[in-house]
C-alpha cells in the first residue's frame, strides 16, 4: 500500500516535501511553539473552549527552489470531531501558513477524547497534505475529598481507565479496592492497578505507582500513594490476560493533605 501510494503521488507538487506542523499554545506569541499537536489534561483547560494557532511550514530539499516557489496548495480543512472548530479552507505556499483552531473541551464528558484536523488537497482527489492530532483528557471533579470509582466488570485482558482531579492541598491518597461477583467462586482474582500523574520537571518513576493485587471475594485492600494537588490523577485497572474468570471491581480514593507552614520565631538571650 505504501509503495502504491508513493507511485500514485510522485508528481504531486509537495511530493517528498516535509510538512512541518507546530502549535502555539494560548497566551504565547506566534512563533513560540513547543508542541506537535494539542494535548489538554488539566481541569481548568478541559472545562473551557481553548484557541490554538497552527502553523504549517513546507520544507523542500536543498536545490528544489523552483518547486518551493511554485507551491500553491488549495487545501480544505476538516475536523474529525464536532467539538473541534476549524476554518473551511487554507491556501498553502512555500512560506507556510497559520490558522486558528478552537477546542471546545467544555462540551465533553469526563474521559479520554481524541480528534484530528486534516488538511486535504482539493485539486488532487482529497489527498491528505497534513494533519494535527488532538487529545483531551478530561478528569472527573469530585464534590468532596472522596472519589468513588464506578463499579466495573473486568474480564481477561480488559483495561479500565478513569481520570480524576486531585483537590488542591492534597498530598496523599488512600486507595481502597474490593472485588465481588467472582465468575469462579471461592477463588482469588489477580489484577494490575496503575496510578499516574504528569508533573512538570518530575521523571515518570517519581509520579507513577503500580501494584499487582490478589483479592479474595469481598475482601478490601488499601494502598497509600503520594499525590500532587490541583493535577489530574489517572487510575487504571487491568486484569491479566492469563486470568479467564471475570469479576466486579469497586474502588474508593480518599484524598488527604498536610502541608507545613514555615514560621519565624525570635528569642532573646543573655
Regions found by a protein language model. Give the residues of each.
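Extracellular and analogous surface-interaction loops
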Residues: 44, 161-171, 223-229
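Acidic, Ser/Thr/Pro-rich low-complexity intrinsically disordered segments
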Residues: 153-160, 164-206
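C-terminal edge strands of extracellular/lumenal beta-sandwich accessory domains
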Residues: 69-71, 107-108, 118-146, 182-187, ...
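Short, solvent-exposed loop/turn segments enriched in Ser/Thr/Gly
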Residues: 46-54, 95-97, 106-118, 158-160
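Short proline/glycine- and polar residue-rich coil/turn motifs
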Residues: 88-96, 124, 212-217, 227
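Non-catalytic extracellular/lumenal accessory regions of secreted precursors
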Residues: 9-45, 56-66, 119-122, 127-163, ...
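Surface-exposed binding patches on compact interaction domains or structured appendages
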Residues: 16-39, 47-49, 53, 57-102, ...
